[in-house]
């Protein structure tokens, strides 16, 4: 029995079990891309039914691969079938219901099945209908942003678990998709990477391609993880190199017409763009990393609470558009502004609004809190990274850690900005107001934490005095707790960027 016959036999068996449930069966992946290699590849299928699969149908389907092998001993294909079986409605709308899953590690009856964005693109671009009505017109083509997210997750898995040559092909295909937005067969991706000199270990990639082409004969597929790491470094750089394609796709999602797109900054997975059109210019911020996308929700939160922000124009789940400060009623602050008492007064008014309007929200919603970083584990990290284990201060802190944490947690909470610096500050051109932007570190905390943060960055005693006078009363007992809490938190966060922290301990 050859591959095509095995696919037909399996299709017939599935249809027989689901005959009263109008099954639609798709084949996609390496078989359709003419890249199936026995000993390496799977046979990817998707089975969608008119209504939820019954318990009886599920019990027959879940072990069908094994049953087919019993009927056709020695068949090399039946164990390679993988995929999900569920109703079309549940699959398309991502609902939970009785689902049959076949995977490399086994099979089970579960409650959902989802194809990642790369698999969905394969299904919609090149999938073959084996049986039933074609319903792909009801499915949504994955976004380029979704593909980037899935590729990033796959690269992290490669870094952690990559000890076989196949990971090199996965990374090569990821680079191809980042550059083109399209899916390519794994073997072709490896060859493309070689032709374009993308893999730092060309010999390893050549071996990988040979292994895939002769998978049935070449049993040795192991590889040193350091080779995977080096190629993963290449694709990490590719995320930055393809940031413009990402930005263009996000503008398309938001239906924003534009003439030119110019890069302002691209750092650590966050790219900032000036978008020019006949109607003027706006600024767009795109986030490759999930953890930084919280800024989108933070803008919306502040707006809902009546806290002044730059105009928030449009957004997706991974980018947003705001007014361009160069053509705004605001101007970017300079370091000189931090010494101006009049500017300090405007800053104090913004912070007072943030703290007053944010108190109820902070006390009823889970949010990032710097005090949560004060743990024995993090203190040990500080000591280890700074080589300061013998300092008496650590013994004092560790002996009183519960008291310190308890005192910090008892302080009243409100919203905290946490990141004041003049580069995050804008001042109204008519000097009527000032506000801060960049809300990635917005969280909850006690009032004095923000007051101390601002006062440390103001450039003169007069500015600090003006800020404190305008802000008004606050609980000065918070300062006593903050003297300890800020010391510990500051050193923990400093580890991420300050190699000379030990010199100041």
Give a label for each model feature.
Residues 345, 453-456, 465-505:
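Helix-rich C-terminal or lid/interface subdomains of diverse kinases
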Residues 1-26, 57-58, 385-404:
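Helical scaffold of the NTase/Pol beta-like nucleotidyltransferase catalytic core
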Residues 115, 122-240:
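Conserved nucleotidyltransferase catalytic core and NTase-mimicking acidic/glycine-rich helix/loop elements
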Residues 269-271, 276-366:
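ATP-binding pocket architecture of kinase catalytic cores
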Residues 415, 428-468, 476:
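Active-site Asp-x-Gly
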Residues 25-63, 80-83:
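Catalytic metal-binding acidic patch
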Residues 334-392, 411-413, 443-444:
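A cross-family kinase active-site recognition segment
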Residues 58, 63-161, 174:
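Conserved NTP/Mg2+-binding pocket subregion across the NTase superfamily
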């Amino acid at each position: 029995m050859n591959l095509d016959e095995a696919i037909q036999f399996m299709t017939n068996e599935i249809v027989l079990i689901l005959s009263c449930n109008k099954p639609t069966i798709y084949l996609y992946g390496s078989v359709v891309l003419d890249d199936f290699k026995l000993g390496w590849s799977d046979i990817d299928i998707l089975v969608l039914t008119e209504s939820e699969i019954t318990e009886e149908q599920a019990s027959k389907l879940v072990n069908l691969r094994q049953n087919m092998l019993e009927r056709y001993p020695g068949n090399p294909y039946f164990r390679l079938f993988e995929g999900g079986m569920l109703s079309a409605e549940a699959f398309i709308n991502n609902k939970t219901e009785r689902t049959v899953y076949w995977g490399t590690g086994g099979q089970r009856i579960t409650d959902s099945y989802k194809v990642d964005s790369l698999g969905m693109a394969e299904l919609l671009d090149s999938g073959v209908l084996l049986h039933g009505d074609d319903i792909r017109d009801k499915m949504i083509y994955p976004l380029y942003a979704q593909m980037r997210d899935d590729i990033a997750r796959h690269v992290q898995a490669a870094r952690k678990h990559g000890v076989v040559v196949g990971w090199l092909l996965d990374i090569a295909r990821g680079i191809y998709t980042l550059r083109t937005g399209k899916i390519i067969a794994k073997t072709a991706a490896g060859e493309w990477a070689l032709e374009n000199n993308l893999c730092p270990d060309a010999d390893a990639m050549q071996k990988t391609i040979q292994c895939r082409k002769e998978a049935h004969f070449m049993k040795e597929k192991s590889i040193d993880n350091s080779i995977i790491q080096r190629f993963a470094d290449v694709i990490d750089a590719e995320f930055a190199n393809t940031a413009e394609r990402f930005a263009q796709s996000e503008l398309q999602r938001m239906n924003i017409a534009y003439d030119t797109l110019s890069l302002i900054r691209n750092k650590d997975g966050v790219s900032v763009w000036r978008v020019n059109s006949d109607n003027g210019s706006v600024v767009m911020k795109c986030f490759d990393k999930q953890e930084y996308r919280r800024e989108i929700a933070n803008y919306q939160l502040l707006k809902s609470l009546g806290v002044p922000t730059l105009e928030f124009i449009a957004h997706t789940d991974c980018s947003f558009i705001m007014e361009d400060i160069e053509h705004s009623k605001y101007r970017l602050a300079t370091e000189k502004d931090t010494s101006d008492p009049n500017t300090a007064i405007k800053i104090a008014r913004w912070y007072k609004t943030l703290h007053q309007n944010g108190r109820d929200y902070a006390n009823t919603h889970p949010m990032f809190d710097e005090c949560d970083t004060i743990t024995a584990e993090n203190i040990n990290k500080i000591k280890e990274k700074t080589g300061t284990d013998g300092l008496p201060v650590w013994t004092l802190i560790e002996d009183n850690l519960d008291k310190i944490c308890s005192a910090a947690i008892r302080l009243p909470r409100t919203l905290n900005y946490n990141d004041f610096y003049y580069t995050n500050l804008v001042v109204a051109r008519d000097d009527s107001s000032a506000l801060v932007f960049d809300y990635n570190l917005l969280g909850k905390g006690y009032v004095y934490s923000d007051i101390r943060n601002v006062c440390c960055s103001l450039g003169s005693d007069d500015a600090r005095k003006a800020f404190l006078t305008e802000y008004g009363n606050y609980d000065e007992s918070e300062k006593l707790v903050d003297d300890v809490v800020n010391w510990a938190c500051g050193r923990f966060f400093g580890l991420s960027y300050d190699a000379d922290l030990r010199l100041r301990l």
